[in-house]
Protein backbone atom coordinates (compact mmCIF):
# COMPACT_ATOMS: atom_id res chain seq x y z
CA UNK A 1 0.00 0.00 0.00
CA UNK A 2 2.94 2.37 0.56
CA UNK A 3 3.91 2.04 -3.11
CA UNK A 4 0.28 2.36 -4.16
CA UNK A 5 -0.14 5.66 -2.29
CA UNK A 6 3.15 6.94 -3.67
CA UNK A 7 1.93 6.47 -7.26
CA UNK A 8 -0.55 9.27 -6.49
CA UNK A 9 2.35 11.47 -5.29
CA UNK A 10 1.33 11.04 -1.67
CA UNK A 11 4.27 11.54 0.68
CA UNK A 12 4.39 8.59 3.09
CA UNK A 13 6.21 7.71 6.30
CA UNK A 14 6.22 4.00 7.17
CA UNK A 15 6.42 3.44 10.95
CA UNK A 16 5.50 0.52 13.26
CA UNK A 17 2.54 0.58 15.63
CA UNK A 18 3.81 2.20 18.86
CA UNK A 19 4.67 0.08 21.87
CA UNK A 20 6.87 2.20 24.16
CA UNK A 21 5.84 5.50 25.76
CA UNK A 22 8.42 7.27 23.61
CA UNK A 23 6.81 5.84 20.46
CA UNK A 24 3.34 6.89 21.65
CA UNK A 25 4.63 10.43 22.30
CA UNK A 26 6.27 10.55 18.87
CA UNK A 27 3.05 9.46 17.18
CA UNK A 28 1.04 12.10 19.03
CA UNK A 29 3.27 14.80 17.54
CA UNK A 30 2.46 13.78 13.96
CA UNK A 31 -0.59 16.03 13.76
CA UNK A 32 1.68 19.03 14.31
CA UNK A 33 4.11 17.84 11.61
CA UNK A 34 1.71 18.42 8.73
CA UNK A 35 0.57 14.85 8.11
CA UNK A 36 -2.96 14.67 6.72
CA UNK A 37 -3.87 11.11 7.78
CA UNK A 38 -2.66 7.88 9.34
CA UNK A 39 -3.22 4.54 7.60
CA UNK A 40 -3.10 1.08 9.19
CA UNK A 41 -3.98 -2.47 8.16
CA UNK A 42 -6.00 -3.80 11.12
CA UNK A 43 -4.85 -2.54 14.53
CA UNK A 44 -1.97 -4.81 15.48
CA UNK A 45 -1.85 -7.45 18.21
CA UNK A 46 -1.08 -5.23 21.22
CA UNK A 47 -4.24 -4.78 23.36
CA UNK A 48 -2.60 -1.76 25.03
CA UNK A 49 -2.48 0.05 21.68
CA UNK A 50 -6.14 -0.71 20.96
CA UNK A 51 -7.08 0.43 24.49
CA UNK A 52 -5.26 3.76 23.95
CA UNK A 53 -6.39 4.34 20.37
CA UNK A 54 -9.20 6.78 21.15
CA UNK A 55 -6.83 8.91 23.24
CA UNK A 56 -4.31 8.89 20.40
CA UNK A 57 -6.93 9.95 17.88
CA UNK A 58 -8.15 12.80 20.08
CA UNK A 59 -4.56 13.97 20.60
CA UNK A 60 -3.45 13.77 16.96
CA UNK A 61 -6.74 15.07 15.50
CA UNK A 62 -6.19 13.91 11.93
CA UNK A 63 -8.15 11.15 10.13
CA UNK A 64 -7.12 7.62 11.04
CA UNK A 65 -7.75 5.30 8.09
CA UNK A 66 -8.10 1.63 9.05
CA UNK A 67 -8.42 -1.15 6.49
CA UNK A 68 -9.62 -4.25 8.31
CA UNK A 69 -8.47 -7.44 6.60
CA UNK A 70 -9.49 -9.46 9.66
CA UNK A 71 -12.71 -9.47 11.71
CA UNK A 72 -13.04 -5.94 13.21
CA UNK A 73 -14.75 -7.36 16.31
CA UNK A 74 -11.41 -8.81 17.37
CA UNK A 75 -10.06 -5.24 17.63
CA UNK A 76 -13.01 -3.89 19.60
CA UNK A 77 -14.35 -1.96 16.62
CA UNK A 78 -16.32 0.26 16.49
CA UNK A 79 -16.15 1.09 20.22
CA UNK A 80 -12.32 1.22 20.20
CA UNK A 81 -12.24 4.08 17.67
CA UNK A 82 -13.29 7.73 17.83
CA UNK A 83 -15.89 8.16 15.05
CA UNK A 84 -14.87 11.80 14.53
CA UNK A 85 -11.38 10.78 13.43
CA UNK A 86 -11.94 7.30 11.96
CA UNK A 87 -12.37 6.22 8.34
CA UNK A 88 -12.76 2.44 8.44
CA UNK A 89 -12.77 -0.03 5.57
CA UNK A 90 -13.38 -3.80 5.66
CA UNK A 91 -12.44 -6.47 3.12
CA UNK A 92 -15.53 -8.58 3.86
CA UNK A 93 -18.91 -7.35 2.58
CA UNK A 94 -21.10 -9.40 4.96
CA UNK A 95 -19.15 -8.23 8.02
CA UNK A 96 -19.32 -4.65 6.71
CA UNK A 97 -23.10 -4.84 6.44
CA UNK A 98 -23.53 -6.55 9.83
CA UNK A 99 -21.42 -3.97 11.70
CA UNK A 100 -23.14 -1.09 9.92
CA UNK A 101 -26.56 -2.25 11.19
CA UNK A 102 -25.51 -1.94 14.84
CA UNK A 103 -26.22 1.38 16.61
CA UNK A 104 -22.49 1.91 17.23
CA UNK A 105 -21.77 0.93 13.63
CA UNK A 106 -24.09 3.63 12.31
CA UNK A 107 -22.06 6.22 14.21
CA UNK A 108 -18.77 4.77 12.96
CA UNK A 109 -19.65 3.04 9.65
CA UNK A 110 -17.53 0.56 7.74
CA UNK A 111 -16.90 0.87 4.01
CA UNK A 112 -16.49 -2.30 1.96
CA UNK A 113 -13.04 -2.47 0.33
CA UNK A 114 -11.99 -5.88 -1.08
CA UNK A 115 -8.44 -7.16 -1.19
CA UNK A 116 -6.40 -6.75 -4.38
CA UNK A 117 -3.08 -7.69 -6.00
CA UNK A 118 0.21 -5.97 -6.77
CA UNK A 119 0.99 -6.54 -10.48
CA UNK A 120 4.63 -5.62 -9.89
CA UNK A 121 4.92 -8.75 -7.74
CA UNK A 122 2.33 -11.09 -9.28
CA UNK A 123 2.33 -11.39 -13.05
CA UNK A 124 2.17 -14.10 -15.70
CA UNK A 125 5.44 -15.78 -16.60
CA UNK A 126 6.00 -17.97 -19.63
CA UNK A 127 4.21 -21.24 -18.95
CA UNK A 128 6.71 -24.12 -19.03
CA UNK A 129 6.01 -27.20 -21.13
CA UNK A 130 6.15 -29.31 -17.95
CA UNK A 131 4.44 -27.82 -14.89
CA UNK A 132 5.92 -28.33 -11.45
CA UNK A 133 2.41 -28.93 -10.09
CA UNK A 134 0.19 -30.43 -12.81
CA UNK A 135 -2.23 -31.54 -10.07
CA UNK A 136 -2.80 -28.02 -8.77
CA UNK A 137 -1.59 -26.20 -5.69
CA UNK A 138 -2.95 -24.90 -2.39
CA UNK A 139 -1.15 -22.29 -0.30
CA UNK A 140 -2.39 -21.55 3.21
CA UNK A 141 -2.41 -22.64 6.84
CA UNK A 142 -4.47 -25.48 8.28
CA UNK A 143 -6.08 -22.93 10.61
CA UNK A 144 -5.62 -19.40 11.87
CA UNK A 145 -4.17 -19.58 15.37
CA UNK A 146 -6.59 -18.39 18.05
CA UNK A 147 -5.72 -19.51 21.57
CA UNK A 148 -9.03 -18.36 23.09
CA UNK A 149 -11.17 -20.31 20.62
CA UNK A 150 -8.90 -23.36 20.73
CA UNK A 151 -9.17 -23.43 24.54
CA UNK A 152 -12.96 -23.14 24.30
CA UNK A 153 -13.03 -26.10 21.90
CA UNK A 154 -10.86 -28.22 24.21
CA UNK A 155 -12.67 -27.42 27.45
CA UNK A 156 -16.35 -27.27 26.43
CA UNK A 157 -18.04 -30.61 27.30
CA UNK A 158 -19.60 -32.36 24.30
CA UNK A 159 -18.34 -29.75 21.85
CA UNK A 160 -17.27 -32.19 19.13
CA UNK A 161 -20.51 -34.16 19.44
CA UNK A 162 -22.48 -30.92 19.02
CA UNK A 163 -20.47 -29.97 15.94
CA UNK A 164 -20.82 -33.23 14.01
CA UNK A 165 -24.42 -32.61 12.80
CA UNK A 166 -23.53 -28.99 12.00
CA UNK A 167 -20.62 -30.17 9.89
CA UNK A 168 -22.99 -32.53 8.08
CA UNK A 169 -25.18 -29.55 7.14
CA UNK A 170 -22.35 -27.22 6.22
CA UNK A 171 -20.20 -29.56 4.13
CA UNK A 172 -23.06 -30.31 1.70
CA UNK A 173 -23.73 -26.63 0.98
CA UNK A 174 -20.91 -24.16 1.56
CA UNK A 175 -23.20 -21.33 0.46
CA UNK A 176 -24.82 -21.59 3.88
CA UNK A 177 -23.35 -19.32 6.53
CA UNK A 178 -21.60 -21.34 9.28
CA UNK A 179 -22.41 -18.49 11.67
CA UNK A 180 -26.13 -18.86 10.91
CA UNK A 181 -25.95 -22.66 11.22
CA UNK A 182 -24.29 -22.36 14.64
CA UNK A 183 -26.71 -19.72 15.96
CA UNK A 184 -29.78 -21.67 14.82
CA UNK A 185 -28.46 -24.83 16.48
CA UNK A 186 -27.74 -23.00 19.73
CA UNK A 187 -31.18 -21.35 19.70
CA UNK A 188 -32.84 -24.76 19.28
CA UNK A 189 -30.66 -26.37 21.94
CA UNK A 190 -31.25 -23.67 24.57
CA UNK A 191 -34.87 -22.91 23.68
CA UNK A 192 -34.10 -19.19 23.91
CA UNK A 193 -34.71 -16.33 21.50
CA UNK A 194 -31.96 -15.45 19.04
CA UNK A 195 -31.55 -11.88 20.30
CA UNK A 196 -31.21 -13.22 23.84
CA UNK A 197 -28.40 -15.67 23.14
CA UNK A 198 -26.62 -13.24 20.81
CA UNK A 199 -26.33 -10.84 23.74
CA UNK A 200 -24.71 -13.54 25.91
CA UNK A 201 -20.87 -13.43 25.73
CA UNK A 202 -20.57 -17.17 26.42
CA UNK A 203 -22.96 -17.97 23.58
CA UNK A 204 -20.99 -15.69 21.26
CA UNK A 205 -17.80 -17.48 22.29
CA UNK A 206 -19.42 -20.86 21.58
CA UNK A 207 -20.48 -19.73 18.08
CA UNK A 208 -17.04 -18.27 17.31
CA UNK A 209 -15.44 -21.55 18.43
CA UNK A 210 -17.91 -23.59 16.37
CA UNK A 211 -17.24 -21.55 13.23
CA UNK A 212 -13.49 -21.83 13.86
CA UNK A 213 -13.66 -25.63 14.03
CA UNK A 214 -16.00 -25.91 11.03
CA UNK A 215 -13.51 -23.84 9.06
CA UNK A 216 -10.66 -26.16 10.00
CA UNK A 217 -12.65 -29.26 9.00
CA UNK A 218 -13.72 -27.61 5.72
CA UNK A 219 -10.21 -26.65 4.68
CA UNK A 220 -8.66 -30.00 5.59
CA UNK A 221 -11.33 -32.06 3.83
CA UNK A 222 -11.35 -30.01 0.62
CA UNK A 223 -7.58 -29.73 0.33
CA UNK A 224 -7.07 -33.45 0.94
CA UNK A 225 -9.74 -34.36 -1.64
CA UNK A 226 -8.80 -31.85 -4.35
CA UNK A 227 -5.01 -31.78 -4.27
CA UNK A 228 -3.78 -35.22 -5.24
CA UNK A 229 -1.06 -36.73 -7.40
CA UNK A 230 1.07 -34.08 -9.07
CA UNK A 231 -0.15 -31.39 -6.69
CA UNK A 232 1.51 -29.43 -3.93
CA UNK A 233 0.44 -27.95 -0.59
CA UNK A 234 2.34 -25.12 1.09
CA UNK A 235 1.72 -23.89 4.62
CA UNK A 236 2.29 -24.83 8.26
CA UNK A 237 3.78 -28.18 9.23
CA UNK A 238 0.40 -29.51 10.40
CA UNK A 239 -0.31 -30.27 6.72
CA UNK A 240 2.42 -32.93 6.80
CA UNK A 241 0.28 -34.97 9.22
CA UNK A 242 -2.82 -34.51 7.05
CA UNK A 243 -1.59 -35.05 3.48
CA UNK A 244 1.90 -36.53 3.82
CA UNK A 245 4.21 -36.38 0.79
CA UNK A 246 2.23 -33.66 -1.00
CA UNK A 247 3.33 -31.18 1.66
CA UNK A 248 5.96 -28.85 0.19
CA UNK A 249 6.84 -26.81 3.27
CA UNK A 250 6.33 -23.14 3.97
CA UNK A 251 6.65 -20.44 1.32
CA UNK A 252 7.53 -16.75 1.27
CA UNK A 253 4.94 -14.31 -0.02
CA UNK A 254 6.19 -12.57 -3.14
CA UNK A 255 8.53 -13.84 -5.86
CA UNK A 256 8.65 -17.40 -4.53
CA UNK A 257 4.87 -17.63 -4.39
CA UNK A 258 4.51 -16.11 -7.87
CA UNK A 259 6.79 -18.82 -9.26
CA UNK A 260 4.67 -21.56 -7.65
CA UNK A 261 1.44 -20.08 -9.03
CA UNK A 262 2.90 -19.80 -12.52
CA UNK A 263 4.01 -23.45 -12.45
CA UNK A 264 0.63 -24.85 -11.33
CA UNK A 265 -2.26 -26.21 -13.39
CA UNK A 266 -4.67 -24.39 -11.06
CA UNK A 267 -4.76 -22.66 -7.69
CA UNK A 268 -7.23 -23.91 -5.07
CA UNK A 269 -8.82 -21.28 -2.82
CA UNK A 270 -10.63 -22.03 0.45
CA UNK A 271 -11.53 -19.25 2.87
CA UNK A 272 -10.70 -19.17 6.55
CA UNK A 273 -13.71 -18.83 8.91
CA UNK A 274 -12.96 -15.17 9.72
CA UNK A 275 -13.74 -14.42 6.05
CA UNK A 276 -17.50 -14.81 5.69
CA UNK A 277 -17.79 -13.59 2.11
CA UNK A 278 -14.53 -11.66 1.66
CA UNK A 279 -12.40 -12.89 -1.24
CA UNK A 280 -8.91 -14.01 -0.34
CA UNK A 281 -5.53 -12.77 -1.53
CA UNK A 282 -5.11 -16.03 -3.46
CA UNK A 283 -7.91 -15.19 -5.90
CA UNK A 284 -6.42 -11.84 -6.87
CA UNK A 285 -2.76 -12.93 -6.93
CA UNK A 286 -3.30 -16.19 -8.83
CA UNK A 287 -5.54 -14.38 -11.32
CA UNK A 288 -2.87 -11.69 -11.79
CA UNK A 289 -0.55 -14.56 -12.77
CA UNK A 290 -3.18 -15.71 -15.29
CA UNK A 291 -3.60 -19.08 -13.57
CA UNK A 292 -6.97 -20.87 -13.28
CA UNK A 293 -8.59 -20.46 -9.85
CA UNK A 294 -10.86 -23.07 -8.25
CA UNK A 295 -12.61 -21.42 -5.30
CA UNK A 296 -15.52 -21.94 -2.94
CA UNK A 297 -18.57 -19.83 -3.67
CA UNK A 298 -19.03 -16.34 -2.27
CA UNK A 299 -21.65 -13.76 -3.30
CA UNK A 300 -18.75 -11.33 -3.68
CA UNK A 301 -17.56 -13.32 -6.69
CA UNK A 302 -20.63 -12.09 -8.56
CA UNK A 303 -19.90 -8.49 -7.55
CA UNK A 304 -16.18 -8.36 -8.31
CA UNK A 305 -15.86 -10.88 -11.16
CA UNK A 306 -17.83 -12.58 -13.91
CA UNK A 307 -17.69 -15.99 -12.20
CA UNK A 308 -18.79 -18.15 -15.13
CA UNK A 309 -16.29 -16.50 -17.47
CA UNK A 310 -13.34 -15.83 -15.15
CA UNK A 311 -13.29 -18.32 -12.25
CA UNK A 312 -14.53 -21.79 -11.27
CA UNK A 313 -16.48 -21.98 -8.00
CA UNK A 314 -18.13 -24.76 -5.99
CA UNK A 315 -20.55 -25.20 -3.09
CA UNK A 316 -19.44 -28.69 -1.96
CA UNK A 317 -16.64 -31.18 -2.51
CA UNK A 318 -18.50 -33.15 -5.19
CA UNK A 319 -18.92 -30.04 -7.34
CA UNK A 320 -15.29 -29.15 -6.69
CA UNK A 321 -14.05 -32.56 -7.86
CA UNK A 322 -16.04 -32.29 -11.08
CA UNK A 323 -14.73 -28.78 -11.75
CA UNK A 324 -11.18 -29.93 -11.09
CA UNK A 325 -11.57 -32.70 -13.68
CA UNK A 326 -12.84 -30.18 -16.22
CA UNK A 327 -9.97 -27.79 -15.50
CA UNK A 328 -7.41 -30.51 -16.16
CA UNK A 329 -9.21 -32.04 -19.15
CA UNK A 330 -9.70 -28.73 -20.96
CA UNK A 331 -6.59 -26.59 -20.32
CA UNK A 332 -7.30 -24.23 -23.23
CA UNK A 333 -10.70 -23.27 -21.80
CA UNK A 334 -9.22 -23.02 -18.29
CA UNK A 335 -6.45 -20.72 -19.51
CA UNK A 336 -8.97 -18.58 -21.41
CA UNK A 337 -10.96 -17.99 -18.22
CA UNK A 338 -7.74 -17.28 -16.33
CA UNK A 339 -6.77 -14.64 -18.91
CA UNK A 340 -10.16 -12.95 -18.48
CA UNK A 341 -9.68 -12.98 -14.69
CA UNK A 342 -6.22 -11.47 -15.10
CA UNK A 343 -7.63 -8.64 -17.22
CA UNK A 344 -10.30 -8.00 -14.56
CA UNK A 345 -7.72 -7.82 -11.77
CA UNK A 346 -5.44 -5.46 -13.71
CA UNK A 347 -8.34 -3.17 -14.66
CA UNK A 348 -10.21 -3.13 -11.32
CA UNK A 349 -8.44 -4.92 -8.47
CA UNK A 350 -4.87 -3.69 -7.92
CA UNK A 351 -3.65 -1.92 -4.79
CA UNK A 352 -3.46 1.27 -6.82
CA UNK A 353 -7.21 0.99 -7.35
CA UNK A 354 -7.72 0.50 -3.60
CA UNK A 355 -5.42 3.43 -2.73
CA UNK A 356 -7.38 5.64 -5.14
CA UNK A 357 -10.67 4.65 -3.46
CA UNK A 358 -9.23 5.42 -0.02
CA UNK A 359 -7.91 8.82 -1.12
CA UNK A 360 -11.28 9.70 -2.67
CA UNK A 361 -13.06 8.96 0.62
CA UNK A 362 -10.44 10.96 2.54
CA UNK A 363 -10.90 13.92 0.19
CA UNK A 364 -14.64 13.95 0.88
CA UNK A 365 -14.17 14.25 4.67
Residue ranges of each PLM-predicted region?
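Short beta-strand/turn micro-motifs composed of small residues
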Residues: 66-68, 90, 140, 235, ...
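Catalytic binding pocket for nucleotide-activated donors in carbohydrate/polymer assembly enzymes
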Residues: 1-17, 81-82, 93, 98-100, ...
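Nucleotide-sugar donor-binding catalytic core of glycosyltransferases
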Residues: 1, 108-275, 298-301
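Short, surface-exposed amphipathic charged segments that create phosphate/polyanion-binding patches used
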Residues: 79-83, 123-134, 327-330
Amino acid sequence: MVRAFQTFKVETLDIPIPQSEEEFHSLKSMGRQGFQAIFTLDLGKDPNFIFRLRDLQESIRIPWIIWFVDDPEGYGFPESCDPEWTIAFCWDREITQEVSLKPSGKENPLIHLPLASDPEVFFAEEIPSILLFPGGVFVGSTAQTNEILEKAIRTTPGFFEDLEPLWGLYRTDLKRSPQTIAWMYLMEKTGLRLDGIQADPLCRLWVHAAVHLLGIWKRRELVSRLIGQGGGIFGDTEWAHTIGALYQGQITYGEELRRVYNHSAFVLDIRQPQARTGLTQRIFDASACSRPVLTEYSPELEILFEPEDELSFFANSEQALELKKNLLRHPEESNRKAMHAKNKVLSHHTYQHRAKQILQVLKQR
